[in-house]
């Protein structure tokens, strides 16, 4: 069995140096002009073992790395959006990952998100603490190993870096990982290695390459074994139009061999399987050749994993990014394999919930997994831009439950023809390219909606209140009774039903006035003239009596269960006076049943 190069993905927060690191690795290997050099693939860069050994020198021999691993295969598109898009059955396509962070900036939202995604896919990784050249007092040693450059720094600079490394160790510990600076790691199987580097000056990059090679050799050789004669397995990166070629697909082949004229099976956006024949397999020309040629690609008869290639074939328009790619063979029902994989990918949805849209299968799976962990129901989940059908579907969900009238859109846009539909609907769109932030915004929105709903509900509930009928201030005895009152607790509102101290209904508040002004409600301590519909002074109550707002039993239970802490002290006292009055008539009034 042949061992292929491990596929390496670089993740981290924006501006923390993902692209700079990849550019430096490519640049230094091209500049080295060693035998074999680098191979530029579609969407990836392969650095052979010989080149790494020549760059790393003695460091490789110190790690006792043998020539088991042919090289390192770096995915060119950095970031976790690319990481989740590149998937294979059972997890991420990347065998190893580099989590990069700015040593001066520490953990940022996308760092945590990348860490969660690595955790989700159980991908082995190293942490690269970048931008050591920005530490105060740092003396740059271009391209040097970390050990060499670190030993030439002032003690204060060394201490400063150590402090920052231990802050990273602390954050990783909070996230459930044991870690240490790479040269202090005692067990590479249980501790994450932190490598301080400068992607700009190249300091420490030697150790990054050597550590990746060493980890792959020590822990991944079995999963890197491939049968170079077996039908190819791969993952589609993207579908794109190329001048002179028509619609093509870019793919990473991670197992087996792919040949021109092979029949391949792919997944369509309709969740059907496309079988098509490869017309040509293409790889970019080396940079130096590209300058002297009008062509961008070189045609190949075959490629063996790991390889990043462009495929020209008929009918690729509706193939999905992230789709599995399989070569048809007599031994295996590949079409059924793809259908099985589609079944695994197809997201189980509920009758109610929010809508989820993403750019690729892998991204969709990652977003849905995170939503499931948050116990958020999903009505529909699909790949592609937000369209009119999505907005209609989400509007229906809103009518059933306004918290479900939301669309989570990761790395996709709203279709231009649907923007007006969205603006005219009640649907709330949460979109962006950082899953962590989108979900945080959604949670905040849900929380606010729930608080608003609770407040509206609380405002609508009849709450405890009472007043006293002031002596010698009876302006009319009945039809309606008009009396002078003083509010003793709570808020009295027009229309509220009133009871006396015996629990009998005396009537309802028709109106309240003060100095000729009609008042819809009054608070404790206010004195007003009150008209009480259906009440007769002297029969239903006397001057000087206290009257209570009549609270429906259902409202009392809501207050008791959910809103008791919102009552003022005087409202609280009035509630229990009112309860005593009610229980003189019915001892079970306000009691909770077994299932309440």
Swiss-Prot record:
The keyword Transferase does not apply. Residues 37-41 are annotated as: G2. It comes from Methanobrevibacter smithii (strain ATCC 35061 / DSM 861 / OCM 144 / PS). GTP binds at residues 12-19, 76-80, 130-133. Keywords: GTP-binding, Initiation factor, Nucleotide-binding, Protein biosynthesis. Residues 130-133 are annotated as: G4. Residues 76-79 are annotated as: G3. Residues 3-220 form the tr-type G domain. The lineage of its organism: Archaea, Methanobacteriati, Methanobacteriota, Methanomada group, Methanobacteria. GO terms for molecular function: GTP binding; GTPase activity; translation initiation factor activity. Residues 12-19 are annotated as: G1. This is Probable translation initiation factor IF-2. NCBIfam families: aIF-2, PRK04004.1, small_GTP. Belongs to the TRAFAC class translation factor GTPase superfamily. Classic translation factor GTPase family. IF-2 subfamily. Gene3D superfamilies: P-loop containing nucleotide triphosphate hydrolases, Translation factors, Translation initiation factor IF- 2, domain 3. The keyword GTP-binding applies. GO terms for cellular component: cytoplasm.
């Amino acid at each position: 069995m042949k061992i292929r190069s491990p596929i390496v993905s670089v993740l981290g927060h924006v501006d923390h140096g993902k692209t700079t690191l990849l550019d430096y690795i490519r640049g230094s290997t091209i500049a080295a002009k060693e035998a074999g050099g680098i191979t530029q693939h579609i969407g990836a860069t392969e650095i052979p073992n010989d080149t790494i050994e020549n760059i790393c020198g003695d460091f490789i021999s110190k790690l006792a790395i043998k020539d088991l691993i042919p090289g390192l295969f770096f995915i060119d598109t950095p970031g976790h959006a690319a990481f989740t898009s590149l998937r294979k059955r059972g997890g991420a396509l990347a065998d190893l990952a580099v989590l990069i962070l700015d040593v001066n900036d520490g953990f940022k939202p996308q760092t945590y998100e990348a860490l969660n995604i690595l955790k989700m896919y159980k991908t082995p990784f190293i942490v690269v603490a970048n931008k050591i050249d920005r530490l105060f007092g740092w003396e740059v040693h271009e391209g040097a190993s970390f050990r060499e450059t670190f030993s030439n720094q002032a003690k204060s600079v060394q201490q400063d870096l150590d402090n920052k490394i231990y802050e990273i160790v602390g954050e990783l510990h909070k996230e459930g990982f044991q870690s240490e600076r790479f040269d202090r790691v005692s067990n590479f199987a249980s501790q994450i290695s932190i490598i301080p580097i400068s992607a700009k000056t190249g300091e420490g990059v030697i150790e990054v390459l050597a550590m990746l090679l060493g980890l792959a050799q020590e822990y991944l050789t079995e999963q890197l074994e491939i049968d170079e004669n077996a039908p190819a397995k791969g993952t589609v990166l993207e579908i794109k139009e190329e001048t002179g070629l028509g619609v093509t697909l870019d793919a990473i082949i991670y197992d087996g061999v792919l040949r021109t004229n092979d029949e391949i099976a792919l997944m369509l956006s309709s969740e059907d399987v496309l079988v098509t024949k490869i017309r040509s397999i293409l790889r970019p020309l080396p940079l130096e050749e590209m300058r002297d040629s009008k062509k961008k690609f070189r045609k190949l008869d075959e490629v063996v994993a790991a390889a990043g290639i462009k495929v020209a074939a008929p009918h690729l328009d509706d193939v999905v990014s992230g789709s599995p790619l399989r070569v048809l063979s007599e031994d295996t029902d590949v079409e059924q394999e793809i259908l099985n994989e589609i079944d695994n990918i197809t997201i189980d949805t509920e009758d109610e919930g929010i809508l989820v849209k993403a750019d690729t299968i892998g991204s969709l799976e990652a977003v849905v997994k995170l939503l499931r962990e948050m116990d958020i129901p999903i009505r529909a989940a699909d790949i592609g831009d937000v369209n009119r059908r999505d907005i209609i579907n989400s509007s229906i969900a809103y009518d059933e439950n306004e918290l479900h009238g939301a669309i989570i859109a990761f790395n996709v846009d709203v279709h231009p023809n649907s923007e007006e539909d969205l603006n005219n609907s009640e649907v709330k769109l949460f979109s962006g390219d950082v899953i962590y932030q989108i979900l945080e915004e959604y949670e905040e929105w849900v929380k606010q909606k729930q608080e608003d709903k609770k407040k509206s509900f609380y405002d609508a509930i009849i709450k405890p209140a009472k007043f006293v009928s002031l002596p010698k201030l009876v302006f009319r005895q009945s039809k309606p009774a008009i009396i002078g009152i003083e509010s003793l607790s709570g808020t009295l509102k027009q229309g509220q039903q009133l009871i006396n101290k015996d629990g009998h209904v005396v009537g309802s508040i028709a109106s309240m006035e003060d100095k000729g002004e009609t008042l819809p409600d009054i608070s404790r301590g206010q004195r007003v003239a009150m008209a009480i519909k259906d009440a007769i002074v002297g029969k239903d109550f006397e001057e000087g009596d206290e009257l209570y707002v009549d609270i429906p039993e259902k409202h009392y239970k809501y207050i008791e269960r959910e809103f008791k802490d919102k009552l003022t002290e005087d409202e609280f006292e009035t509630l229990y006076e009112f309860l005593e009055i009610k229980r003189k008539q019915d001892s079970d009034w306000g009691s909770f049943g077994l299932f309440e």
